[in-house]
Each structure stands twice: as C-alpha cells, then as structure tokens.
A protein has these predicted regions:
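Extracytoplasmic electron-transfer domains, predominantly the class I c-type cytochrome c fold
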Residues: 17-19, 24-81
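Sequence/structural segment immediately N-terminal to covalent heme-attachment motifs in c-type
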Residues: 1-19
C-alpha cells in the first residue's frame, strides 16, 4: 500500500485531497469523496474519466498500479482518525480554527447577554 499511497498522491490527491475526501475544483466543479465507494467504481472511474476527471489509460497508470491505489484508499478508509473530529481529515489547523470560531462566538454571545442584562 505504500506504492499505492505514492501513486495516489501523484495522480489523485490534487483533486480528491490527500485523504481521498474530495473537494472543490475550478469553475464550480467538485471531486467526490472516495471513501465508502466500491473498488469497482473507483477502477471504472480511472479508465473512463467521468465528468472533469482525466482518463488514466493503462499506458499512464497500469492495471496493477490502479489496484494498488484502490488498496491504499481502502486501507486509509479503515484507519481510525486519531486527531479528534474528522472534519475531512484536513488536520489540526482546521480543527483549531473551528475551536477558535466557536469560542469567540460564545464570548461575543456572553458579552451581548451581559450588555442586555445591564440595561
């Protein structure tokens, strides 16, 4: 699966993000998540290139490499998220930002409530 991870990062991560969670593309397009998708559908998508996805012919990515990518996706799918709230496995920056936004929102709410109570 290490080879599959490298192949995924080189061929797929720019659209589906490094964790296979999908994401926004240009011109309002979207790359779907690969988590929870049947392996045969992932393989078919690689050879047909649906929507704005490129076609990965056998000359570009061999069938063995395609299967290695799928194996890596399935292994990543079953890994526990040790970082807390998943948030698309974007990482600690997003999780920290969410904490700050919620915390500041609560502080503003308390300040408004105290100001209203003082009147």
């Amino acid at each position: 699966t290490a080879d599959g991870g490298e192949l995924f990062r080189n061929n797929c991560a720019m659209c589906h993000n490094f964790a296979g969670q999908g994401g926004a593309l240009t011109q309002g397009k979207y790359a779907p998540t690969l988590m929870g998708v049947e392996p045969k559908h992932i393989y078919e998508a690689m050879i047909t290139g649906p929507q704005s996805m490129p076609v990965f012919s056998d000359k570009v990515v061999t069938p063995e490499e395609k299967l290695s990518i799928i194996k890596w996706i399935k292994a990543a799918e079953s890994e526990p998220n040790l970082g807390g709230a998943a948030l698309g496995r974007v990482g600690p920056v997003t999780e920290g930002l969410l904490g700050w936004v919620l915390g500041l929102g609560m502080l503003i709410g308390v300040a408004v409530w105290l100001a209203m109570k003082a009147k």
